[in-house]
Amino acid sequence: QLDSFFGAPGAAQALDTVFNEFSAALSSLAAEPAGAAARAEVIATAQGLAGGLNRMAGKVQDARNDADAAIRASVEEVNAALATIEDAERQLAALPGGHGRADVLDARDRAIDALARLADIRVSERGAGRIAIHTTGGAVLFAGKASRLTFEPVHPLVAGAEGGGIGMTDGEGHAQPLHSGLLRSGEIAGLLALRDETLPALQQGLDAVAAGLARAASE
């Protein structure tokens, strides 16, 4: 998706094309400072480049908002998986012997697999077939009772605005932020990095190009 922001190299609306056209116009103007046609070409190509930068900036913000929405959906998936695991543990404790346990264990395993896709987790045995689930950073997701994640998206997420963080309330009611030290990898961590690091860095690069364009146009 990030590559699509710039356009296919050499395409008419691609950033490299409009930038090269602007650079060529500046060179022509430098060779013929009094030429009206050269000045007009600089203005036209500068406008084209500015328009391209604005379009890209809009795509960056759209992508940040998309990432924010995806974080919310992923948090809801985590909560659903943890609720399934808690329910499975309750059923397992009530089932006599091996009767009906296989289906419940299968459901629990599927929920664990879903969690492993969304977050970096470590599953440990607690005895009597019970399990505990932590993130590799140490956050307790399940230990007899399911933790619950919370997330409030910021919409619209405009340039320069910070996105919301993820909170966690464990099974005993203790709340804490689920920061990057506790959530190191997985789909949610990747979305947070995209929203808070990768895309803002791209926006800063666009801002730097726009500032350089303004300086060049004023010289």
PLM features per residue range, with description:
Residues 1-219:
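Structural signature of extracellular appendage/secretion-system components
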